């Protein structure tokens, strides 16, 4: 898992971050597309 995975997951689950914010973390290389799918529950699409 990426270093920020748990923190990003907790932000998303708490409603502090939207799906678009988590998606931006993938494009910035902070988390992987696979981690996005685990957090959001949807397939990552650019």
Spans of model-derived segments:
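Viral virion structural and adsorption modules
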Residues: 1-46
